[in-house]
A protein has these predicted regions:
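Non-catalytic accessory segments flanking P-loop/AAA+ NTPase cores
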Residues: 28-29, 40, 120
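P-loop NTPase nucleotide-binding/switch module
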Residues: 6-8, 15, 22, 35-86, ...
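Conserved catalytic/coupling modules of large nucleotide/cofactor-utilizing molecular machines
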Residues: 1, 172, 190, 200-376
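Switch/coupling sub-region of P-loop NTPases
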Residues: 73-96, 100-254, 261-265, 269-270, ...
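Glycine/charge-rich, flexible interdomain linkers and switch-proximal surface loops
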Residues: 18, 22-23, 166, 356-363
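Short, charged beta-turn/beta-strand-edge "cap" motif at the junction between a beta-strand
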Residues: 12-17, 33-34, 94-95
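Short, compositionally biased
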Residues: 21-32
Length: 376
């Protein structure tokens, strides 16, 4: 127990986490200590890494053909394709399905054997950590997963550092073991929240948005470490909590600017019974190009986005004059848009034990074919 008046000796070392195969299948905290009750992680001979030590910058130009990782979730594979080595964010308020969607992605992608998986729980519920652990254990995926937790009951130091610690270990496996990494973080907003708490304790003056004065550079440094080089790739999926459902919040915008694609979950969509509750008009991706997804997928995406925008404008007109007053062409487009929205609804595998409904997965070709059928 630490208390006032105790003697403190400085070791001259930073916070170091264990590395290597001994960490796979284990649950660690921000300091690299085990949380799973399965004994110590390694021994005194286990190599350790300073979590703040940045890897040497690559001098090689890493140009590789984009590789799409299929998730089996239609709305993601179509609107925000999961591209190896890139960053995708799931943005939404409380209770709209961010964690469920993340767990489904872990379940679907990790089973494909696409690489070593990392899951980092930052400031989230302990219950969700237990559920994820049980899900991975049942699917026999722990043997290919590293887990870090700094849950909401922990002090702000643990919550602020746990993301950095997990990134440091991911860098080790990428650079030393030449592994491709799938990095899942839930929730990046809690990282900012934890740093805010630390800034308040230290008496720092907040910036104009009410956040820690150095938060922009702190987030930038962390995001820059989630990158690929000639040794391997880090593909990251991050959830971002939206306080009071305000997507214009400075912290949300700050993280969003670091991402290649954003999946926006909406309470209004969830209230319609659509799962996953994705707002199709606000969801966007810079990776949705002909060079990455191909001409067929790209042309369909342009047609679908145009139809969905028209659907939103027609909804306002229908509220005033009724659907029967629309022209035949508008009625046809309105009906197609409603079919498309329903087409992107699907049951999740990770929810099967809760609701008894079997989950479904679809290949990208199946998704494109179903959309072509609706648009025909």
């Amino acid at each position: 127990r630490i208390q006032k008046g105790m003697r403190v000796d400085r070791t001259g070392k930073g916070i170091q986490v264990p590395t290597g195969a001994v960490t796979i299948g284990r649950i660690l905290d921000a300091l690299g200590d085990p949380l799973d009750g399965q004994g110590p992680v390694g021994d005194e001979n286990t190599p350790r890494k300073d979590i703040l030590q940045l890897p040497a910058r690559s001098t090689e130009l890493n140009i590789q053909k984009p590789e799409i990782l299929e998730t089996g979730i239609k709305v993601i594979d179509f609107f925000t394709p999961f591209v190896k080595g890139r960053k995708i964010g799931i943005i939404g308020g409380a209770g709209v399905g961010k964690t469920v969607l993340t767990m489904e992605l872990i379940n679907n992608i990790a089973q494909s054997g696409a690489g070593l998986s990392f899951f980092t729980g930052i400031g989230e519920r302990i219950r969700e950590g237990h559920e994820l652990y049980d899900t991975l254990k049942e699917a026999d995926l722990l043997k290919n997963t590293c887990m870090f937790f700094g849950q909401m009951n922990e002090n702000p130091i643990q919550r602020a550092l746990v993301g950095i610690s997990s990134v440091a270990l991911a860098e080790y496996f990428r650079d030393e073991q030449k592994k491709n990494i799938l990095f899942f973080a839930d929730n990046m907003f809690r990282y900012i929240q934890a740093r805010n708490e630390l800034a308040t304790i230290l008496g720092q003056i907040p910036n104009e948005g009410g956040y820690e004065p150095t938060i922009f550079s702190d987030v930038k440094i962390l995001q820059d470490r989630l990158s690929s080089n000639e040794n391997g790739s880090i593909t990251s999926l991050q959830t971002i909590y939206v306080p009071a459902d305000d997507i214009t919040d400075p912290a949300v915008q700050m993280i969003q600017h670091e991402l290649d694609a954003t999946i926006v979950l909406s309470r209004a969509v969830a209230e319609q019974g659509i799962r996953p509750a994705v707002d199709l008009n606000k969801t966007s991706s810079s990776l949705l190009t002909p060079e990455i997804v191909g001409d067929r997928h790209y042309v369909l995406s342009v047609q679908v986005q145009s139809l969905l925008q028209k659907y939103e404008s027609l909804k306002s007109i229908i509220a005033i004059i009724g659907e029967n007053e629309l022209s035949p062409a508008d009625r046809s487009d309105y009906a197609k848009a409603k079919k498309l929205i329903q087409n992107f609804t699907q049951d999740m595998h990770v929810m099967e034990k809760h609701n008894g409904i079997p989950g479904k997965s679809y290949t990208r070709d199946e998704t494109l074919a179903s959309i072509e059928e609706i648009l025909a």
